[in-house]
Amino acid sequence: MDTRVKTATLFDLRSWSAGCLDRVERALERWVTAEAPAGLDHGAPAELVEAMRYAVLDGGKRLRPLLVLAACKAVQGNEGAAMRAACATELIHAYSLVHDDMPCMDNDILRRGKPTVHVKFGEATALLAGDALQALAFELLTPEDATFPAAMQAQLCRLLARAAGSAGMAGGQAIDLASVGERLSERQLRDMHELKTG
């Protein structure tokens, strides 16, 4: 009788992440383009589309999409729906960075070593690009040809809206802006950062 323990195949996080990141990049490239089925084929001005693409396709760690795809893998969920949700979270993140960098917020001129969207395209286009990225995120969660029920689509939209809205990221940013020059307790800082990260 063979008493040796068979070694289970270990999950290769690095390989899995690289594959997911490649798929996320391709999906973002497909959905944030002038030919995209998710709404940008309606004659969006070229500069707006260019600003949106600049904001989203400029790299980044893509941690949020990886977390969504990891959750999908853990529960053996629908990979197509998960990719849409993964990209939606990245679009929300990108829109928040575009707005956060603007002069009325943090007035950053560089992001990831490149001029911020408002520096490259102007404030008005940056604001609209951020707004359009946010709208596109919700559109990705509600495809016309969805293989998952409308009630689930609505629930996903509700969750994302809460995480990004006044009870989440936007609320945290409002606290951040209101507290400039103020001394915050560790608890207040923690609460603000928890809200800002959705």
What do these predicted regions represent?
Residues M1-A88, I92, V98, M105-D106, ...:
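Conserved N-terminal diphosphate/IPP-binding helix and adjacent helical/loop segment
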Residues A34-E35, L140, E144:
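A general secondary-structure boundary signal
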Residues A82-M105, R158-G172, T197-G198:
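Active-site alpha-helical segments that house and flank conserved acidic catalytic motifs
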Residues L28, Y95, A137-L141:
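Alpha-helical membrane-inserting segments
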Residues H42, G59-K61, A124-D131, A135-L136, ...:
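All-alpha helical catalytic cores of prenyl diphosphate-utilizing isoprenoid enzymes
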